């Protein structure tokens, strides 16, 4: 008698082929993403910052020439078109040469993107990034109005990220997502954030919990309760059923 949980021959073969592909991938471990922390400086003072970034730090930005040599070395070993360079910080827009950096990455055949708080993302700066071949961007939104400003420590933060989202929606050639860090203050307003993003035309939204390091480690407002973690999961489940906006979830 066939066991109810047994696999068919076809499925067993497919599973074995998948396992072999995974074994090869683990052994080869091909490079697919390269993160460049191009600066430790930041123009905000976020409550949850894991690196305690500030406007002025004692560490100089990595020179573009140095990172260019890294890229040239990587290009000798792998296809640049298959390695996505993610420019992070600190806040990448603190660098006066950020567009030049992006152009240097793009000219070497690497697709690239940026993670930004959008405070310094003016239309002129955004155009310079487009001219430099930017492929993608992640911007942060942790609430509507004062909720976001409270999290980011700046009264202009919400206004600027609101404008940044509008600019990104108007340029569909740039893939982008919005990142929301859930905390005790904005937990009850996730539906408001969702409705705001849907009306804006946002297609990708990442909802994450705050990792308790850096400033977040000493801030009780960043520590979710077990019931709140469960509530996030229920919220994601319901939102996925609605289908209004795609989701990614990381806890």
Locate each region found by the language model.
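Radical SAM enzyme [4Fe-4S]-AdoMet core and its adjacent flexible, acidic
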Residues: 1, 132, 136, 140-142, ...
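Conserved alpha-helical substructure of the radical SAM core
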Residues: 2-136, 224-228
């Amino acid at each position: 008698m066939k066991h109810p949980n047994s696999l068919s021959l076809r499925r067993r073969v497919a599973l074995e082929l998948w396992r072999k592909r995974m074994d090869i991938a683990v052994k080869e471990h091909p490079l697919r993403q390269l993160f460049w922390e191009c600066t430790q400086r930041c123009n905000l003072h976020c409550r949850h910052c894991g690196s305690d970034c500030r406007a002025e730090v004692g560490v100089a930005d990595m020179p573009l020439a140095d990172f260019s040599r890294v890229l040239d070395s990587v290009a000798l070993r792998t296809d640049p078109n298959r390695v996505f360079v993610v420019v992070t910080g600190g806040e990448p827009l603190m660098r006066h040469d950020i567009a030049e950096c992006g152009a240097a990455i793009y000219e070497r055949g690497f697709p690239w993107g940026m993670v930004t708080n959008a405070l310094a993302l003016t239309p002129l700066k955004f155009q310079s990034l487009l001219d430099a071949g930017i492929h993608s961007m992640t911007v942060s939104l942790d609430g509507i109005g004062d909720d976001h400003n409270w999290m980011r420590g700046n009264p202009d933060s919400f206004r600027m990220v609101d404008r940044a989202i509008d600019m990104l929606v108007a340029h569909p050639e740039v893939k982008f997502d919005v990142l929301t860090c859930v905390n005790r203050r904005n937990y009850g307003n996730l539906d408001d954030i969702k409705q705001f993003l849907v009306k804006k035309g946002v297609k990708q939204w990442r909802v994450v919990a705050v990792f308790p390091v850096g400033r977040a480690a000493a801030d009780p407002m960043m520590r979710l309760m077990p019931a709140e973690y469960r509530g996030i999961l229920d919220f994601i489940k319901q939102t996925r059923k609605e289908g209004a906006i795609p989701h990614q979830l990381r806890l």
